[in-house]
From Swiss-Prot:
GO terms for biological process: cytoplasmic translation. GO terms for molecular function: GTP binding; GTPase activity. This is Guanylate binding protein 128up. Catalyzes the conversion of GTP to GDP through hydrolysis of the gamma-phosphate bond in GTP. Dfd/deformed is required to activate 128up in maxillary segment cells. GO terms for cellular component: cytoplasm. The keyword Nucleotide-binding applies. The lineage of its organism: Eukaryota, Metazoa, Ecdysozoa, Arthropoda, Hexapoda. Residues 290-366 form the TGS domain.
């Protein structure tokens, strides 16, 4: 472990010393690729044993979505969780109070949302310091990250936390790079650019790929990509998670400072202690989770509006709905009757591939 950390430290120092220009781009690209490989080793060391096995760290996934609270120690994560979900997570006015993952659950708009108060991340978590590695491993399983920041401390904390999460392959509020990449057995490196590139050229791409011992591949760049984007695609283990920045303790700042905070993208100012602005926070959480509620309607009965079937936005077909209820239903499926905004007629007969909208009502008709 220490040798990996030493190598990472040496590469980061060299990158900091190297001036960024066209002449050094290939060298920097190579260093970035080496750094990504070392970080992968750090995340998943060889010769498993299934993790550290420390008590309280991984929590069984329950509910329709999982939200992780990430932040430096003593920024108010535990207070926020207790006030949102009524869960007691040990709170004190000194750092490192929460030492295990504390789960809570809230019901919002019919969906059950699991909330995880993760132990405070300290600087250097991605390098194995503190319990940061286990914390970030749990953060990777979340559908949404709440990054809790103390608005009395500068936004430098935000940059540090983003840097820690980036080091573990978590990309916040980003989409996967629009790059086509396929390895092949022969034919060398074939690079196609659909738009002019400001950083990547054939030589730099070959340099990065050679670090991964890849000498035959087809690559299509569909936008002006960076070497970091290409490395993310090659690594293939990146997680893209939406993030909301919660600037806590707004009861201790002026109105003018609050106006500045409101201009920060993906940001909600709150006071966990005084329950201020929780409505805005929950509404934004719902928007970022992109969940869809589908109501069931048994034959001859009224729809059940109390317990919706909750689907994730990218998986909202009738087949996904059937599988969420029970896997056997899709096999016995004949057709479905749908009421709602996804159909022209009320009701409309649809097949298993029909895509549903939020708050549609569905009645399944099985084969006889």
């Amino acid at each position: 472990m220490s040798t990996i950390l030493e190598k990472i430290s040496a590469i980061e120092s060299e990158m900091a010393r190297t001036q960024k220009n066209k002449a050094t781009s290939a060298h920097l690209g190579l260093l970035k690729a080496k750094l990504a490989k070392l970080r992968r080793e750090l995340i998943s060391p060889k010769g498993g044993g299934g993790g550290t096995g420390e008590a309280g760290f991984e929590v069984a996934k329950t509910g329709d979505a999982r939200v992780g609270f990430v932040g430096f120690p003593s920024v108010g994560k535990s207070t926020l969780l207790s006030n949102l979900a009524g869960v007691y997570s040990e709170v004190a006015a000194y750092e490192f109070t929460t030492l295990t993952t504390v789960p809570g659950c809230i019901k919002y708009k019919g969906a059950k949302i699991q909330l995880l108060d993760l132990p405070g991340i300290i600087e250097g978590a991605k390098d194995g310091k503190g319990r940061g590695r286990q914390v970030i491993a749990v953060a990777r399983t979340c559908n949404l990250i709440f990054m809790v920041l103390d608005c009395l401390k500068p936004l430098g904390h935000k940059k540090l936390l983003e840097h820690e999460l980036e080091g573990f392959g978590i990309r916040l509020n980003k989409k996967p790079p629009n790059i086509y990449y396929k390895r092949k057995d022969k034919g060398g490196i074939n690079l196609n650019s659909m738009v002019p590139q400001s950083e990547l050229d054939t030589d730099l791409v070959k340099t990065i790929l050679s670090e991964y011992k890849i000498h035959n591949a087809d690559i299509t760049l569909r936008y002006d990509a960076t070497s970091d984007d290409l490395i993310d695609v090659i690594e293939g283990n990146r997680i893209y998670i939406p993030c909301i920045y919660l600037l806590n303790k707004i009861d201790q700042i002026s109105i003018e400072e609050l106006d500045v905070i409101y201009k920060i993208p993906h940001c909600v100012p709150i006071s966990a202690h005084h329950h201020w602005n929780f409505d805005d926070l929950l509404e934004l959480m719902w928007e970022y989770l992109r969940l869809q509620r589908i109501y069931t309607k048994p034959k001859g009965q009224l729809p059940d509006y109390n317990s919706p079937v909750v689907l994730h936005n990218e998986r909202t077909s009738i087949e996904d709905f059937c599988n969420k209820l029970h896997r056997s239903i899709a096999k016995e499926f004949k057709y479905a009757l749908v009421w709602g905004s996804s159909v022209k007629h009320q009701p409309q007969k649809v097949g298993i591939e029909h895509v549903l909208n939020d708050e549609d009502v569905v009645q399944i008709v099985k084969k006889v």
